[in-house]
UniProtKB/Swiss-Prot annotation:
Signal peptide: none annotated. Substrate binds at N123, T173, K177, R295, H327, S379. The modification N6-carboxylysine is found at K201. Its main location: plastid. This is Ribulose bisphosphate carboxylase large chain. Residues 1-2 form a propeptide. The record marks K334 as: Transition state stabilizer. GO terms for molecular function: magnesium ion binding; monooxygenase activity; ribulose-bisphosphate carboxylase activity. Pfam families: RuBisCO_large (PF00016), RuBisCO_large_N (PF02788).
């Protein structure tokens, strides 16, 4: 008998295919504090029992494969396998279930979102036994989150760097997003910043195209920042998009931004990838740069209710990988975002400890053990009439970003910035005086417009603009 045959015989190997649930469905399992916990929305194919579907998810995202293999006997599956430990039906859905899976921490490389996602949201999402699969939430244990640097700086450090307290920060995406020359682009940045905004932003599409190469844009934007700072006495910034075709080129752009002395750079973290994002976040902490994160491509992943990854998971992953700001929807603007769900993942971005709350889509209690927080960015189809609602919904620790709502002002960019700053200051003052922004918001804006012709003009332009469509992402 060969040594190989002896090994197979000694572990009782029996070739063939057996149900996943025999090994991976463990309803008696008590989860450990060190386990990564996942909540999957599972839609099995007709005839596939929920227990088998949930067990298949646990198996295919951890140690399992479609058939028994003799090398199972060379390791301890009980130590390394994922376990489907609970299954519950989804209210109002006949064939959907929430499958809870526990993964032992040894399955994952320390400090690597890339490795974590490769397992948990890898090949299993194409598994034929499932009609659809969506990752609704993850519980990241402190033992794992402590292996990540997280955001380069966090909310408090950013406020200290900018010397700005007690209100949301104001931003603006430069439009048109594509086609401007570098000098005209810099001019638009200057006008917005001198009008009262804290930040301006490269659109996520802006990298280094023939009409505007990145180095030229960086230089003219830096000039605009320094000129606006000198005139206003406030610290200003522009999100210089360092996203590039290679990690090496991305880092070269970040290094040049640091050499210019600007306060912040930007990255498209989903199209750029988690490995690139984590590398950039480490550089930003080491070199004093803030990092703004755009979520381009997120709706491809998170918008379908039955399949994909919920944005709360992508938000948690970003907090681990690293970013000081991230776009998070508006609730009231043109982009997707239901209020309670949005506030749920906003808290997951900002707060240190978040209790389980299914009414807001939070499946697990999350303890970040002092990992720095991320400022949520509200952006997309918002204007001055939205300011009371945005201030009330997002609170002080946020960035309110008006692109068309600044540059679309009939008098130009600087008056558009003035209108937004006046509206924000009026809302913050009214809130601090105890007024109800949700109920009195329009009146607060009208009162402020009496003393600000720029705000009055903005109110007139956008008085009828609404984006009233039902949210796709509901509980």
């Amino acid at each position: 008998m060969s040594p190989q045959t002896e090994t197979k015989a000694s572990v009782g190997f029996k070739a063939g295919v057996k149900d996943y649930k025999l090994t991976y469905h463990t309803p008696d399992y008590e989860t450990k504090d060190t386990d990564i916990l996942a909540a999957f929305r599972v839609t099995p194919q007709p005839g596939v029992p929920p227990e088998e579907a949930g067990a298949a998810v646990a198996a295919e995202s951890s140690t399992g494969t479609w058939t028994t293999v003799w090398t199972d006997g060379l390791t301890s599956l009980d130590r390394y396998k994922g376990r489907c430990y609970h299954i519950e039906p989804v209210a109002g859905e006949e064939s959907q279930f929430i499958a809870y899976v526990a993964y032992p921490l040894d399955l994952f490389e320390e400090g690597s979102v890339t490795n974590m996602f490769t397992s948990i949201v890898g090949n299993v999402f194409g598994f034929k036994a499932l009609r659809a699969l969506r990752l609704e939430d993850l519980r990241i244990p402190p033992a794992y989150s402590k292996t990540f640097q997280g955001p380069p700086h966090g909310i408090q450090v950013e406020r200290d760097k900018l010397n700005k307290y007690g209100r949301p920060l104001l931003g603006c995406t430069i439009k048109p997003k594509l086609g401007l020359s570098a000098k005209n682009y810099g001019r638009a940045v200057y006008e917005c910043l001198r009008g009262g905004l804290d930040f301006t932003k490269d659109d996520e599409n802006v990298n280094s195209q023939p009409f505007m190469r990145w180095r030229d844009r960086f230089l003219f934007c830096a000039e605009a920042i320094y000129k606006a700072q000198a005139e206003t006495g406030e610290i200003k910034g522009h999100y210089l998009n360092a996203t590039a075709g290679t990690c090496e080129e991305m880092m070269k752009r970040a290094v040049f931004a640091r050499e210019l002395g600007v306060p912040i750079v930007m990255h498209d973290y989903l199209t750029g990838g988690f490995t690139a994002n984590t590398s950039l976040a480490h550089y930003c902490r080491d070199n004093g740069l803030l990092l703004h994160i755009h979520r381009a491509m997120h709706a491809v992943i998170d918008r379908q209710k039955n399949h994909g990854i919920h944005f709360r998971v992508l938000a948690k992953a970003l907090r681990m990988s690293g970013g000081d700001h991230i776009h998070a929807g508006t609730v009231v603007g043109k982009l997707e975002g239901e209020r309670e769900i949005t506030l749920g993942f906003v808290d997951l971005l900002r707060d240190d400890y978040i209790e389980k709350d299914r009414s807001r889509g939070i499946y697990f209690t999350q303890d970040w053990v002092s990992l720095p927080g991320v400022l949520p960015v509200a952006s997309g189809g918002i204007h001055v009439w939205h300011m009371p609602a945005l201030t009330e919904i997002f609170g002080d620790d946020s960035v309110l970003q008006f692109g068309g709502g600044t540059l679309g002002h009939p008098w130009g960019n600087a008056p558009g910035a003035v209108a937004n700053r006046v509206a924000l200051e009026a809302c913050v003052q009214a809130r601090n005086e105890g007024r109800d922004l949700a109920r009195e918001g329009n009146e607060i804006i009208r009162e402020a417009a009496k003393w600000s012709p720029e705000l009055a003009a903005a109110c007139e332009v956008w008085k009828e603009i609404k984006f009233e469509f039902p949210a796709m992402d509901t509980l």
